């Protein structure tokens, strides 16, 4: 068994960081005040502590490199044997955002790492995937490219008020868009492969399956590893109703052979709204069917109302409180959607955007004792460790906050925890997010409802105005902005915006909310004029106030209306 490495430290034994390590790892600690080491045998949460013996490893790109030898000092930690050779220190199943981040960070810390991924495809399946994962290949990136494409029709319409005239009506070629989009995806997956290669991460193509806590099978080839990371993401979910075989999901919607003429989109979440905006902008007839009264469950109520109204003004038809019951194919090839309220006919496509499920099927996790939720999500602790000490999970497969930047954060934190002796919890405070609907949404922090529940005394500032650009275009576009402030501390608890450039604007305010800035800090900040963003630093009087004992939910007579509107 490898000897326990000695950590010479000038940190006091009362240091929280040192106390954490002492609780989690078997360490021989040398402190300045101690003349001899004391060995601490401790529980299993972290898997390994490492000696610094050099090792030469041969990777798939045939380059040799020297790395630190990471050997588990106590087999009771994660079951790995300290004197046994393992092919890798970390084997990751899934080369999406979280898996790639964890793998390349691991090698930068001196560990050996491999990642396996299915062959490239724009549509995921049990046999196809691709390096880059959902975000790069069938999520954030291709969707945003289609959002850009769809916005041009609005720009053409806007431009008339600014003097632009067109001899012919602009037309759109769907085939060109999809071909160019797919070429960009091929370029991006190549970049990701290059990143892995440069980081000395071995990339293995194939489907990975966990055989035991330290063994992975990739299409019949066996690899041993000290730690396994599951980062396989999720897949679109279509409910089991008659005619479901006629439905498309978000993967297919990004890669259709032809543009829809009339499309039914079932779902009221961000994916449904984003695709509704895309197809509406590309001059398709769009109908959105939602089970609830409003779209975007979980978002701020004012934002939910505002975005629904604005999208309706652009010609999208919302069918509220309707549940899908069946899809019926007509003799002419068109589809009808039967709902709890009736039947709507004549659709060229029926799309379901009814959520995503963790992609944990056929990974062998049940056989090794990994605990999962009813929806298939892998249950993890605050350090992303599963119920099996040597198996970890990050990203959408854990169903925590299903955002690409969050998966990146989780992957980086895991690598630090395992291979840098730096136990790191992902920080989920004040995570900003965006919905690329049209108009788009940017939000960070608490909703009004959450703030009232958690703090009681809350001041709400809102502004609903016509942006400068719309004054000449003559279009009904408006912008909604909202600040939620703790009345007792003056701390800004939430920032919400719906309108052009909201996602770009919210990133900066995400820093402000994370830093704990106050409304006074906002008020003391000079605005940039003329911009929509300056509204966030010029809203002086609250629209309404809420107090624990009594609610003043009425509009303030001093409520601010945007200047110049």
UniProtKB/Swiss-Prot annotation:
Listed EC numbers: 1.8.1.7
Binding site for NADP(+): 268, 271, 274, 291, 297, 355, 434
Molecular functions (GO terms): ATP binding; copper ion binding; flavin adenine dinucleotide binding; glutathione-disulfide reductase (NADPH) activity; NADP binding
Binding site for glutathione: 97, 192
Catalytic site: 529 (proton acceptor)
Keywords: Chloroplast, Disulfide bond, FAD, Flavoprotein, NADP, Oxidoreductase, Plastid, Redox-active center, Transit peptide
Swiss-Prot/TrEMBL catalytic activity: 2 glutathione + NADP(+) = glutathione disulfide + NADPH + H(+)
Transit peptide as UniProt keyword: yes
Cofactor annotation comment: Binds 1 FAD per subunit.
Transit peptide as recorded in UniProt: 1-74
Family: Belongs to the class-I pyridine nucleotide-disulfide oxidoreductase family.
Summary of subunit composition and partner proteins: Homodimer.
Protein name: Glutathione reductase, chloroplastic
Organism (species): Arabidopsis thaliana
Gene (name only): EMB2360
């Amino acid at each position: 068994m490898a000897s326990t490495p000695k950590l010479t430290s000038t940190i006091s034994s009362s240091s929280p960081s040192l106390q954490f390590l002492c609780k989690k790892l078997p360490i021989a600690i040398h402190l300045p005040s101690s003349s001899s080491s004391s060995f601490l045998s401790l529980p299993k949460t972290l898997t390994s502590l490492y000696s610094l013996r050099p090792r030469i490893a041969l990777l798939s790109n045939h380059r040799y490199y020297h790395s630190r030898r990471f050997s588990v000092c106590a087999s009771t930690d994660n079951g790995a044997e300290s004197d046994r050779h393992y092919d890798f220190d970390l084997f990751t199943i899934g080369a999406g955002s979280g898996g790639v981040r964890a793998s390349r960070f691991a090698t930068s810390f001196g560990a050996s790492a491999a990642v396996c991924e299915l062959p490239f495809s724009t549509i995921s399946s049990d046999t196809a995937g691709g390096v880059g994962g959902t975000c790069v290949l069938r999520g954030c990136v291709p969707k945003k490219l289609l959002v850009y494409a769809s916005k041009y029709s609005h720009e053409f319409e806007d431009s008339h008020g600014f003097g632009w005239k067109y001899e012919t009506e602009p037309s759109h070629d769907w085939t060109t868009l999809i071909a160019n989009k797919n070429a960009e995806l091929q370029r991006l997956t190549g970049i990701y492969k290059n990143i892995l290669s440069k980081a000395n991460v071995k990339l293995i193509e194939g489907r990975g399956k966990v055989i035991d806590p330290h063994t992975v099978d990739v299409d019949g080839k066996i690899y041993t590893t000290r730690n396994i990371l599951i980062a396989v993401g999720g897949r679109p979910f279509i409910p089991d109703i008659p005619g479901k075989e006629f439905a498309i999901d978000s993967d297919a919607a990004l890669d259709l052979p032809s543009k829809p003429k009339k499309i039914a989109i079932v779902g009221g979440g961000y994916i449904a709204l984003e695709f509704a905006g895309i197809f509406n902008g590309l001059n398709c007839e769009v109908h959105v069917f939602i089970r609830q009264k409003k779209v975007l469950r979980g978002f701020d109520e004012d934002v939910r109302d505002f975005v629904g109204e604005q999208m309706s003004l652009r010609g999208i038809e919302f069918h509220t409180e309707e549940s899908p019951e069946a899809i019926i194919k007509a003799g002419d090839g068109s589809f009808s959607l039967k709902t709890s309220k009736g039947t709507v006919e004549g659709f060229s496509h029926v799309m379901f955007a009814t959520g995503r499920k963790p992609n944990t099927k056929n990974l062998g996790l049940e056989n090794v004792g990994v605990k999962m939720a009813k929806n298939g999500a892998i249950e993890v602790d605050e350090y992303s460790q599963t119920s099996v000490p040597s198996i970890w999970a990050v990203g959408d497969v854990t169903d925590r906050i299903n955002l690409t930047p969050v998966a990146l954060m989780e992957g980086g934190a895991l690598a630090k925890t395992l291979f840098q002796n730096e136990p790191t919890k992902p920080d989920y405070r004040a995570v900003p997010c965006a919905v690329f609907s049209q108009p788009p949404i940017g939000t960070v922090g608490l909703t009004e409802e959450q703030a009232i529940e958690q703090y009681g005394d809350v001041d709400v500032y809102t502004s609903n105005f016509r942006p400068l650009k719309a004054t000449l275009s003559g279009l009904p576009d408006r912008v909604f902005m909202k600040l939620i402030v703790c009345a007792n501390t003056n701390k800004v608890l939430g920032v919400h915006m719906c309108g052009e450039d909201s996602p770009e604007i919210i990133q900066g305010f995400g820093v402000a909310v994370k830093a704990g800035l106050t409304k006074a800090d906002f008020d003391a900040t000079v605005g940039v004029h003329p911009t929509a963003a300056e509204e966030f630093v010029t809203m002086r009087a609250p629209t309404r106030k809420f107090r624990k004992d009594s609610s003043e939910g009425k509009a303030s007579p001093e409520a601010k209306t945007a200047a110049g509107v």
